[in-house]
Curated annotation (Swiss-Prot):
This is Putative regulatory protein BC_3870. InterPro entries: RemA-like. Coiled coil: none annotated. HAMAP family: RemA. It comes from the Bacteria. It comes from Bacillus cereus (strain ATCC 14579 / DSM 31 / CCUG 7414 / JCM 2152 / NBRC 15305 / NCIMB 9373 / NCTC 2599 / NRRL B-3711). Disulfide bonds: none annotated. PANTHER family: REGULATORY PROTEIN SSL2874-RELATED (PTHR38449:SF1), REGULATORY PROTEIN TM_1690-RELATED (PTHR38449).
Amino acid sequence: MAMRFLNIGYGNIVSAHRIIAIVSPESAPIKRTVQEAREHNALLDATYGRKTRAVIVMDDGHVVLSPIQPETIAHRLNNKEDLSEEGWVLHIYEK
């Protein structure tokens, strides 16, 4: 079984199989979601002070801010060959 990780910018990675949604931060409902996550200490800011271009919602309720466009992240997620070539696939073998 392989555990896939996804580069979301500036060397930050998230577990690919735990992503529920990758959305643009511009709409009011997403802004409210980000604010609620901040209030509940469930917000992870991976922008390094740059503009937030994507909001990633994880299956455990965490919200991750990324400086990369949602389309770029989705392309990386769908392109399995790029993930393995860049070293973002971790193979875990269970006994």
